[in-house]
Amino acid sequence: MRTIVVASWTALLLSFLAVAEPALAGDAFILATGRRDPRIYAIDFKAALRTPNDRTPNAIVSRSKVQADRLDGTPLGDPANIVLSEDRRTAYVINHHGAVNNAEFLQHGGRGSVSVMNVRKMLDPRFDNTDAALERSYDSGYFGAVGLLVLPEVLLVSHSENWLTEDGSNRISLIDRKTGSRRGQIEMVLGHPGHACPDFPVPFVSPTPPPVVPFLASDPQFGCWPNPEFIALGNGSDGKTYLFSGNAGTDDVSVMDLKRALAGVPVVEVAPRVPVQTGPFGIKASPNGKLIAVTARESAKVDFEGNTISIIDVDRARTGSPGAELARVRVGTDDPAGESRPFTVAWTPDGREIVVANYRTNNVSIVDVRRALAHDPRAEVARIPVTRLIDPDGIVRPGNPKGTAVTSDGRYAVVSGGPRLDPTAPPSGTVWVIDLHMRAVVATVTGVGNDPYGLTILEDGPD
């Protein structure tokens, strides 16, 4: 068994004492997506760190609806990702399946949407449980929206699904920030899975009939469509910026020429894709943009969940050079055959560590980047359990961590999680605050959505 640091009762006690006076400077809030609960939860970070508020919802200051209610009063939306604007005045929220009622839409392949929200109103308790913070909503340009990057003039939105199916996407949309218009769309080439793929032109040429694709994973006919999940921007030594996508359908990572995409060119992949252990989901660039970390979440072809993250070199990937995957690190489990289902990643600001949420094994890994690049089997330097309180129905359910973020000083990681319950169930999700120095959970916020996904940290408030 590898030697790693785990949270002990002693560490927990010390960590609670350590946060008696929170280290955060200025006001800070966590903005967490409620997912099946179509609201964004604003959590006062300092309040969450106060011991009396631990394992309660007391630090939640407001919950903002991501869509206007349906005419019959039913809440709508499916918030899975959230990214702030440069001035932190606006939050862009990805609704994976758009303005759906989660009690009615019970499949993949809903049309994605983007909610544009006023951050000040999101933090105002007077607007709790209203849509007052919602400024506008627009179509994301395809189905199963998930990844989001905010650029000066456009949003980049990746799509992992096709109409009413889990397979069949090769699209990343470019959405005008001011108008919501779709200004362009990246079209990714199909894969080569070893079985026949649809005769589908890339770029698309009309008229072409819709392709026949698998309805639901796992299915051995997956592998033709990349189905891009989260996306990230890397910096090449040539001075150019490259777009990376984790492709759940083809078990690999694409590298694309961002400048050409912004000029309206639809096909912009510049090199062969980089294979990873299995279908990726979360992907993030290092602070200097030279490395890309990506999770191996699950296979779409067979019943298999991954247990590694990959660290990819931007320059080697963009040039198609061998060894672009610099390191592959097992996380969440000591068993080489164990399935930890790593979900998302976040880098510390100094680029020395990577935080990984392991959904299946209910823990959070800390990966030492220097050790990983040296192929040290001890690169996973900490593994921190995340647990939940008993639910109102008397059942203690697993943590199922998903979203990750790190404070700008590198002191804390925040992680969202919780199982998917019936949409009518009381808010049951959890946000954990982890002290990265103590390697321990130091605060637990309960009652955060239903199956929460992405989250972000707002420090020092909007400009």
List the predicted regions and their residue ranges.
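Bacterial N-terminal signal peptides
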Residues: 7-18
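Predominantly soluble domains enriched in secretory-pathway, periplasmic, or organellar proteins
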Residues: 21-463
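Positively charged n-region of N-terminal signal peptides that target proteins for export
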Residues: 1-6
